[in-house]
Structures are given as C-alpha cells and as structure tokens.
C-alpha cells in the first residue's frame, strides 16, 4: 500500500558507487541536456543562457513526469525520476526569477514581456501551492498543477517573440530550443490529455473485498488479460465508482496470478478512507503497468526482510507466489499491537512449512521498536526493507555500520 501524500522512493545500496552506476543513464541524460544547452547558447547568444537553461529545465520537468518505462529504467526507479523532476522544476523557477531580476524586468515587445511575466507568476504560484499541497484535496492539487503547462506555453511565446529570427531560421540553437520545446509540449499534452485515456490498458473489476482488521481491506481484482509484474512491485489503480476521484493512485501488489490481483489498502487518507468505507464489489478498475525495483527474486540467496505495519504487502506477494521457498530468509515484521498486524496466520503457516524461513514478529508495544544493534545480518545478504521512512533510515544506518558488505534495498511511499 502506498500512503497518500507526496511520493517518495528510495533505493539505497551500501556500495555508493554501485548505487550511482545504476542511475548513470538518467544522470547522464540530465547533465548532457544542460551541458549541451550551455554550449549552444554561449556560442550564439550568451546573454540569454540563463533563460535558455530555464527552458531546457522546464522541458525536462514535463518529460520526467510522463512515467515512461525508459526513464524509470534509466534512473532505476520511478521515485528517483520524481526526485529529479522536482529538482528540475525548482531549478526552473530559480533560473526564471534570476533572469527577471538580471534583466531589470522582462523586456522586449510589450506582449512578449506580458507572456513572460504571466509564466513566472504562474510558476511561482504553483511552487507555493506544492508546498501547501498537504492541505489541499488531491484532485484540486492535480488540476492546479496543470496550469504549469499553460505557463510553459506562455514562456515559449515569450522566448520566440524575444529571439525572433535567431530561433526561426535553421541553426544549432533553433534546433536545440525547438527540440526541447517540442518534447516538452508533447510530454505535457500526453500527461494532461492522453495518459488517463490510453495509459491504462488493463481493465477489470473488483471481485471480492475482505476486511483484514479495523482499518485495512484487501481488494481482489480480476482483469481481462494477464498483468505482468514481479513480487515487490506496485501499480497505479483507477477506480470507476461514483464518489471516487478519477485520478489513479499507486498501491503495492500483495499477490495474484496475472489476471487475478490482490491489493491491500489501509485507511490513511481521503482516498484510502473512501476505499475502506465505500468500495463495492463489481466496480470497474483499470491499471497502467508495474513499477518498482524492489524485486525480491533478484536478491542474493541469503536475504533479510524487514517490514513495518501495512508495508508488509510486497513480501506477502512473494510468499503467496512462492509456496516453496528456495532462499534463506530472515523476516522481521514490526507492528504496534496484534490488532494492527496483518497476515499473521499466513506468516506462521509459511514458517512452519519452510524451515529456511525464519520469522521474527516484533510487537513494539511489548518488545519496543525494532533495531539491529544486537542482531546479526549475514555478511553477503540482500536486505529488503519496506516501512515508515523514519524506521528505514534508522535501521539502514544500523545495518550499514554492522555489515558494510550487505546489499540494502528499501522502498518507502508517500503519494499526493
């Protein structure tokens, strides 16, 4: 389950160089875009290098928001794509403000200046709204974000009206600016007008709903065709039922066989509360595709799993799909009181049938918070963690200090 607020994803390997190398293609893509922009503007119109960088950065912001599989692969995770997306958006604002002040106010033709001012006002407003996002309903927040596209169009008008023939005759500068502008426009158009219509090819309906405890439901979905995913991944789910917002929300897959999928959802926000209280069997749903790089199957033979509360779902998915465990696994599941724990019977039964599955249940009310100061982590193990971000950061430091050779992968979600 992915908690509703801002989206955060972290995959941390204790070998920092390996971690960097896994995202190298994405990092190179961003750096190369900026370097090419700097070199091209310096060679032709160096006085406009700052707004040129702002235009490239804005174009990249739209491109990174498309959730394209290629970008997720380049950055080794959708969450890291979003982190860079936020960076390019913020950088764009800084560059535009600097451009405005350095020029003594936007100048050129009166209309061109007005387009530029409109773009900056909208961008700054969106940034302020983004910081106030937790106080705004998600659907309203999503629609307000679309104003960025309008500001981007105003900004393009401003650039082309100011630059005139330098961008309207074929040369390296016009090719660079035109290419990034076109990619940004296409990306924004896809996000706003096409993604919701063509980006969800898996169509199905809810076939069963099960209350697991006082605030958690398991949703069973049957799809018209198999959904390709691996244990540990998540998907964006749209629910077509009166009273539900039309926007997709991400949830971890907690099991299934391709056409039948399970999602476990905790009541922790407006949308998830609506799911817990009002979702009905028979409602239509759609999915886009599988995301995520916390893929348990790719880990080493010795593994340590660590989970907190509702974030057990990626591990439940693996357990359901692998009744016979072929790895050596130590699983630490932390929860606050058994009434808040999930799938305890399934875990105990799995441990009984698989002697290489070592189960540790940690009730923080009785046992205190889970820590690894006195617990041993096998030297060459892969450690998977999925839980509250504060818990994972604390445990990551403890494990890193104890065993620098461990491969540590953790995933945490918040989504606005």
Q: Residues of each region from the PLM?
A:
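N-terminal membrane topogenic signal
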Residues: 16-30
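FNR/FR-type flavoprotein reductase catalytic core
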Residues: 26-29, 84-192, 259, 268-416
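Short, hydrophobic transmembrane alpha-helix segments
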Residues: 38-48
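Terminal, non-globular segments
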Residues: 49-52, 58
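Membrane-helix interface/capping segments
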Residues: 65-78
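Juxtamembrane/interface segments at transmembrane-helix termini
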Residues: 71, 136-140, 192-202
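Ferredoxin-reductase
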Residues: 196-286, 335-337, 348, 363-365
């Amino acid at each position: 389950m992915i908690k509703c607020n801002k989206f955060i994803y972290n995959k941390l390997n204790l070998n920092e160089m390996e971690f960097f190398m896994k995202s190298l293609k994405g990092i190179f893509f961003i750096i190369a875009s900026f370097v090419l922009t700097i070199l091209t503007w310096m060679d032709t119109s160096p006085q406009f290098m700052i707004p040129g960088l702002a235009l490239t950065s804005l174009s990249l912001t739209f491109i990174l928001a498309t959730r394209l599989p290629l970008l997720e692969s380049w950055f080794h995770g959708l969450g890291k794509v979003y982190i860079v997306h936020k960076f390019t958006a913020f950088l764009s604002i800084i560059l535009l403000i600097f451009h405005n002040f350095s020029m003594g106010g936007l100048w050129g033709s009166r209309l061109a200046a007005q387009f530029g001012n409109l773009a900056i006002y909208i961008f700054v407003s969106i940034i302020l709204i983004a910081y106030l996002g937790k106080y705004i309903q998600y659907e309203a927040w999503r629609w307000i974000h679309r104003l960025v596209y309008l500001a981007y169009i105003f900004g393009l008008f401003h650039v082309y009206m100011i630059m005139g023939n330098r961008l309207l005759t074929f040369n390296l500068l016009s090719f660079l600016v035109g290419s990034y502008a076109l990619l940004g426009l296409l990306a924004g158009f896809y996000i706003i007008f096409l993604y919701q219509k063509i980006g969800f090819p898996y169509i199905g309906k809810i076939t069963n709903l099960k209350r697991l405890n006082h605030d958690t439901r398991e949703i069973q979905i049957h799809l018209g065709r198999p959904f390709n995913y691996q244990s540990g991944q998540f998907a964006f789910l749209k629910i077509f039922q009166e009273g539900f917002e039309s926007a997709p929300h991400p949830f971890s897959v907690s099991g299934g066989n391709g056409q039948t999928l399970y999602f476990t959802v905790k009541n922790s926000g407006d949308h998830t509360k609506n799911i817990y209280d009002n979702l009905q069997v028979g409602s239509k749903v759609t999915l886009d595709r599988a995301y995520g790089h916390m893929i348990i199957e790719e880990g080493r033979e010795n593994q340590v799993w660590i989970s907190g509360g509702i974030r057990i779902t990626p591990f439940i998915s693996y357990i359901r799909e692998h009744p016979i465990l072929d790895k050596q696994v130590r699983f630490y599941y932390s929860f606050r009181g058994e009434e808040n724990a999930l799938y305890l019977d399934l875990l105990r039964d799995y441990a009984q049938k698989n002697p290489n599955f070592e189960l540790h249940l940690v009730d923080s009310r009785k046992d205190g918070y889970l820590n690894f100061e006195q617990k041993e982590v096998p030297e060459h193990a892969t450690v998977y963690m999925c839980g509250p971000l504060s818990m994972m950061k604390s445990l990551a430091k403890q494990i890193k200090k104890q065993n620098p050779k461990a491969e540590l992968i953790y995933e945490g979600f918040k989504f606005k």
